[in-house]
């Protein structure tokens, strides 16, 4: 549940156009996506981001293999056209998460 909440928090901040807060939240990563540029691209295509209850549904979240200490996750952004082209794709580092006491990613990218 923590991982799912964390990934959806990224969607919420993205929907609110809080690129500085996103960068701050992820400042421990070696490479942080250029959220300003990604937001510009998104809003060139779409007028809005759905961050309501339906956007939080299981059809917009994917958890890969959980047999290792690194989990692949995908959070799909629910756009008004139903394209679902924009997606947060990350690897959750369980060892770093245990040490930090909160979800820690080893990488994050935005696919579109």
Model regions and ranges:
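Generic alpha-helical structural element
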Residues: 11-15, 28, 79
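Long amphipathic alpha-helical scaffold segments
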Residues: 1-5, 29-50
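Surface-exposed, charged secondary-structure patches
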Residues: 39-87, 93
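Short, low-complexity N-terminal intrinsically disordered segments enriched in polar/charged residues
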Residues: 1-16
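Short beta-strand edge/turn micro-motifs at domain boundaries
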Residues: 85-112
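Short, well-ordered alpha-helical segments enriched in acidic and aromatic residues
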Residues: 16-30
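Long, compositionally biased intrinsically disordered terminal regions
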Residues: 16, 60-62, 102
